[in-house]
């Protein structure tokens, strides 16, 4: 539950900061503060922070700080693109190397045949590359308000749909001792 809250908390703070705090600058500040609090809480309570969370928070701190210092919202808008590309490369390379990163993230929930983990890695990489393109199209062609609404009300449903589309692969290739 803490992991979920640490990932959704900064998004909620960003949304609230934009619509109730006065725009991208406030939203960015709220997101930065919330992200630092969340990652600190994860470390204090769980004594660990995932590599993906560290990467995500680092990119946020850099792009968010540049946004606040420069006053240019472009930097916070390209943060998702940068993260999606980084994550896409991580999942793609782990599939190519036959050492699927996604296996370590999901193995406590589902156990699959090894080739299924590799397939899931490639699909996840493709999803992240797709999301990078979508983010670029939205932020470059839409208003700040539309981009913020897309980040909250578009990305989450798209991600959920992607996960649902993976269920047939998971169910077909799960091992007998799998939890799902």
From Swiss-Prot:
Subcellular location, record wording: Cell inner membrane
Keywords of this entry: Cell inner membrane, Cell membrane, Membrane, Transmembrane, Transmembrane helix
Superkingdom: Bacteria
InterPro entries recorded: YciB (IPR006008)
Membrane topology, from the record: Multi-pass membrane protein
Pfam families named among the record's database cross-references: IspA (PF04279)
Transmembrane segments: 4-24, 25-45, 49-69, 76-96, 118-138, 150-170
GO terms for cellular component: plasma membrane
Entry's family note: Belongs to the YciB family.
Annotated function: Plays a role in cell envelope biogenesis, maintenance of cell envelope integrity and membrane homeostasis.
Protein name per the record: Inner membrane-spanning protein YciB
Organism: Rickettsia rickettsii (strain Sheila Smith)
